[in-house]
Amino acid sequence: MENREVFVYIVISIFRSLQFLFWRFRPRYNDVTSALTRPLTSAASYDFKFMSYMVNKAKSVNKALEEAVPLREPELKIREAMRYTLLSDGKRVRPMLCLAACELVGGQESTAMSAACAIEMLHASSLILDDLPCMDNDSLRRGKPTNHIVFGESIAILASQALIALAVQKTTSSTFADVPPERILKTVQEMVKAVEGLVAGQQADLAGEGMRFDSDTGLEHLEFIHIHKTAALLEAAAVMGAIMGGGSDEEIERLRSYARCIGLMFQVVDDVLDVTKSSEELGKTAGKDLIAGKLTYPRLMGVEKSKEYAERLNIEAREHLLGFDIDKVAPLVSLADYIVNRQN
């Protein structure tokens, strides 16, 4: 045969082989497509209502947080400051993720509630520190004056440190008849790792202010910041929940990878909202990263490319959920969609 005929023959053969493979694995393909590529609006296909799930989990977490930080003397002022940030209106994404991960691997909500509260305490602590004048210098958080504006910098710092201590205490002081001590130890190790990540990410964030980066080094710098800063607590939330629920090492690592993806995605979306929404819409000061000269995803790649990157991270996050029970994984699939589509 002539070269052209040989080429056509090879192309047709490859096409037929791919067609055979597609039809052979079509049932699995359909499972993956139905589980991982639906938008949030089609979550009803799971017979699963994500917003109701999220609200119910938030109510359970809020009740536990309220009980964990009672007002008492002599540290009344510190506890008022702790409660001010900890109990302020929030979506409770991190504790919800912790509880969902626990349930995904076969555990019960009650088993992971202490860990869920602990992760929210760490989150509240990080918000107080982030807003300080020596850090991000912000005066608005969740639609209210930031902690140091209300209580002063010294009380805010003490409240932040007290929340970290309380997070550890919350995880270790509770006794679980059905949870081996080594699981408790592992959750504490994950918490410590998350705090280390927050510190490293914040330091890199501050160091990068006003610096110029090309596209490659800029993306590398951003990924380092937000894997350690934004993604750290989401990663810890998922892993701690999976550990408490008795997940296997493989399940834990897959959930870690999933959470890292949605953590980065959360930050990409946050950066986009910072330049496209008002302070009233966000409940915090809009455009402050631009004013501070911080490196952000829109600054590095533009708003539209940033949105595309968030969508790619959403797909990647979903891929890490393959193999889990289709019904139990619905909250995490929907959470990824919720994060990529959020407006504040």
From Swiss-Prot:
GO cellular component terms attached to this protein's record: chloroplast; mitochondrion
Positions that bind isopentenyl diphosphate: K91, R94, H123, R142
Residues binding Mg(2+) 2, per UniProt: D130, D136
Location of the transit peptide in the chain: 1-40
Alphabetized InterPro entries for the sequence: Isoprenoid_synthase_dom_sf, Polyprenyl_synt, Polyprenyl_synt_CS, Prenyl_diphosphate_synthase
Catalytic activity: isopentenyl diphosphate + dimethylallyl diphosphate = (2E)-geranyl diphosphate + diphosphate; isopentenyl diphosphate + (2E)-geranyl diphosphate = (2E,6E)-farnesyl diphosphate + diphosphate; isopentenyl diphosphate + (2E,6E)-farnesyl diphosphate = (2E,6E,10E)-geranylgeranyl diphosphate + diphosphate
Subcellular location: Mitochondrion
EC number, as in UniProt: 2.5.1.-, 2.5.1.1, 2.5.1.29, 2.5.1.10
UniProt GO BP: carotenoid biosynthetic process; farnesyl diphosphate biosynthetic process; geranyl diphosphate biosynthetic process; geranylgeranyl diphosphate biosynthetic process
Top-level taxon: Eukaryota
One function term, GO molecular function aspect: dimethylallyltranstransferase activity
Positions contributing to dimethylallyl diphosphate binding: R141, K229, T230, Q267, K284, K294
Manner of cofactor binding, per the entry note: Binds 2 Mg(2+) ions per subunit.
Pathway assigned in UniProt: Isoprenoid biosynthesis; farnesyl diphosphate biosynthesis; farnesyl diphosphate from geranyl diphosphate and isopentenyl diphosphate: step 1/1; Isoprenoid biosynthesis; geranyl diphosphate biosynthesis; geranyl diphosphate from dimethylallyl diphosphate and isopentenyl diphosphate: step 1/1; Isoprenoid biosynthesis; geranylgeranyl diphosphate biosynthesis; geranylgeranyl diphosphate from farnesyl diphosphate and isopentenyl diphosphate: step 1/1
Residues that bind Mg(2+) 1: D130, D136
Coiled-coil stretches noted in the UniProt entry, renumbered to this chain: none
PROSITE patterns assigned: POLYPRENYL_SYNTHASE_1 (PS00723), POLYPRENYL_SYNTHASE_2 (PS00444)
Cofactor(s) the protein requires to work: Mg(2+)
Gene3D superfamilies reported in the protein's UniProt record: Farnesyl Diphosphate Synthase
Keyword field: Carotenoid biosynthesis, Isoprene biosynthesis, Magnesium, Metal-binding, Mitochondrion, Transferase, Transit peptide
Family: Belongs to the FPP/GGPP synthase family.
Oligomeric form and interacting partners: Monomer.
Purpose: Catalyzes the trans-addition of the three molecules of IPP onto DMAPP to form geranylgeranyl pyrophosphate.
Protein name: Geranylgeranyl pyrophosphate synthase 10, mitochondrial
